[in-house]
Structures are given as C-alpha cells and as structure tokens.
A protein has these predicted regions:
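Helix C-cap/helix->beta junction micro-motif
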Residues: 31, 208-209
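Walker B catalytic acidic pair
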Residues: 217
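N-terminal small-domain helix-loop-helix segment of the aminotransferase-like
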Residues: 2-106, 308
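Conserved core segment of the aminotransferase class I/II
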Residues: 151, 234-320
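Conserved core of the PLP fold type I
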Residues: 61-206, 220-236, 243
Length: 322
C-alpha cells in the first residue's frame, strides 16, 4: 500500500495568492471601469528589456543548430552566469565567493521552499510576522511546523516575531534559541528594510546560538539607501551562519521566465545528531534554468535600461498610491 505524506493534508485548503486572484477577478467583472492597484503577488508590469529578448532569440537559434545545441547544463549553472553574478553582485560590495558557492536555479521561491530538504524535520523555526507564505508552507509539508492552531491561525512549532507599527515593523531578536530563522529584506510584504547595524544584530545572534539564517534578498534591486545592505554577506561573520536567495524577477523582470540563484558559503556548516559538522554547500544543488543565457546580457550595457525600468516602477507607485 502506497502511503501519502500526511503533512500535506495539514495545509489550508487554498493558497493565499490564489484566493486574492479569485477575488480580484470577481471584482473586475462587477466593476469593469475600476483601475485596480495590485498589492498581492509582486509581479512586474514592464516588458523585458530589448537586450534580453535578443539574447533569448540567440539562445533559441543555438538550440536549433547541431554545432551550438546545448543539452543538460552544469548542475550548479553555467560558468559564464556564475562568474557574472560574482563580478557584478558581490565584488563591488567587497564580498568574495568561489564559483562553487553560487547555485543558479529556476527562482528564489523554489529554493526557499526546497532548502528545508537538507535540514532535519525537527529543527525549530522562526519567522517574521507577517510573512511570505512559502516559508511556512514548506515547513508544514515536511512536518516541521507542528499543528495549526485554529484560533490564531499559527503553527505550534513556529516562533512568530511580530512586525507591527509599534516596533516600526522591525522584529525583535528572539529571547530563546531557534534553529532556523527566515529573514526577507527588503521585506515582503511590509516593504521595510534593515540597516547594517540592525542586520548585524541578527548575524551576531545566529553566531552565538548556532542558528541558520535563510535570507531572502529577492527585492535587493530596489534598495536606494547606502546604509541598507544588499546582501547579508556585507555583515562580518554571515558566511558562517547564512544562506542567501536571489531572484532576477525584480532585477530583470523575470517573473515569467524564472531564474535566480542561491549562495551557500563553504564556511557554513550544520550538525549531525552525533555532533559532526557538515558543510551545507556540498548538500545543495541547483536546477540550471534555460533562461541563464539571457542573463549574460545583464552586466553588458543593461544597467541603464534596468535603472530606467526601476524608475518607471517608482514613478508609477508614487502616482497611484497615496
């Protein structure tokens, strides 16, 4: 008899963003003349830059020729993209990685969901509240979240760290040890950020408590303040306690293309029950996306188009949200 993973049965009957989409569609039907400002899924509204489209056409033509056809890509992603990521995203900020610490994938969402597969099911979990649903759902599906408390809508084995107007939407450092802490900055859904001193407190906490920080930096492209770090690795010691997730959805408008990457430093370890330290880098892998070739164009003359594109989003935001 084949048995199901009964933890899946604990999930609520519907997904938050699916519910939002249904309500939006219903509203559009009943109010056809209303202009809707969507504050749900962080989708893009501008087309892909011309250079990306040209690169896509070139990549397709390569697949059509016997001389240039590519099959399965390298398990960590193509070297040309990994080298470009290191050169453009990290070296300018004084951060240095080897190519084997960067894992190209089909997006930050899948990686933040799948990363739990290399961690024991009985690790304790901490999340900011409110939180991106994937962080919770992925822990529910592996049995790490515990039992859903109907009255509160919260899970028994998850520590929720409130982000409210009372604390300026900045969570307080926990007063107890937690095995895994999810941080997303700039934050989804509040839009808040952490300064370097504020993020340093979390790194210090993680180092002192042997805590793993899962840092979602999907929205780093929108940071404008010099005192707000684009990467957790701008903080000393973070390579020993943090995994960082990046997305090209906001940098390159790739929500419909799917490509991102995860950084797993070689210095980062976790323990076995016997107390042996195991490098997490060697446990992780990547799903090399076909969109990788397109991203080679990003560092080559595309800074201006992407700067203009981000400026359009900011102007749109300022003109429609009061």
């Amino acid at each position: 008899m084949t048995l199901v993973n009964e933890h899946f049965l604990k999930l609520p009957g519907s997904y938050l963003f699916s519910d939002i989409a249904k309500k939006v569609n219903t509203f559009k039907i009943t109010h056809p003349k209303q202009d809707i400002i969507r504050l749900g899924i962080g989708d893009v509204t501008q087309p892909l830059p011309k250079a990306c489209i040209e690169a896509m056409h070139k990549a397709v033509e390569e697949l059509a020729s016997k001389d240039t056809f590519r099959g399965y890509g390298p398990e960590q992603g193509y070297d040309f993209l990994i080298e470009a990521i290191i050169k453009n995203d990290f070296i300018p900020r004084g951060i240095h990685f080897s190519a084997s610490e960067i894992f190209v994938s089909d997006g930050a969402k899948s990686d933040t969901g799948n990363i739990g597969d290399i961690l024991r099911h009985d690790n304790s979990v901490g999340v900011t509240d409110p939180i991106y649903p994937v962080y919770i759902d992925s822990n529910v599906m592996c049995g790490r979240a515990g039992v859903l408390e109907e009255e509160t809508g919260k899970w028994s084995n998850v520590t929720y760290m409130p982000c409210t107007s009372e604390n300026n939407f900045i969570p307080e450092i926990p007063d107890k040890r937690i095995d895994i802490v999810y941080l997303c900055y700039p934050n989804n859904p509040t839009g808040t950020t952490l300064t370097k001193p504020e993020l340093k407190k979390w790194v210090d906490y993680a180092l002192a408590n042997d805590t793993l920080i899962l840092f979602d930096a999907a929205y780093e492209a929108y940071i404008q303040d010099e005192n707000v770090p684009h990467s957790i690795y701008e903080i000393k010691g973070a390579k020993k306690c943090a995994i960082e997730f990046r997305s090209f959805s906001k940098t390159a408008g790739f929500t419909g293309v799917r490509c991102g990457y995860t950084v797993v430093p070689k210095e980062l370890t976790a323990a076995t029950l016997e107390g042996d330290r195991i490098p997490l880098n060697r446990l992780w892998n990547a799903a090399s996306a076909p969109s990788s070739t397109v991203l080679l164009t990003l560092p080559n003359g595309l800074q201006k188009p992407f700067t203009v594109q981000k400026a359009k989003y900011r102007l749109k935001k300022q003109s429609t949200i009061i």
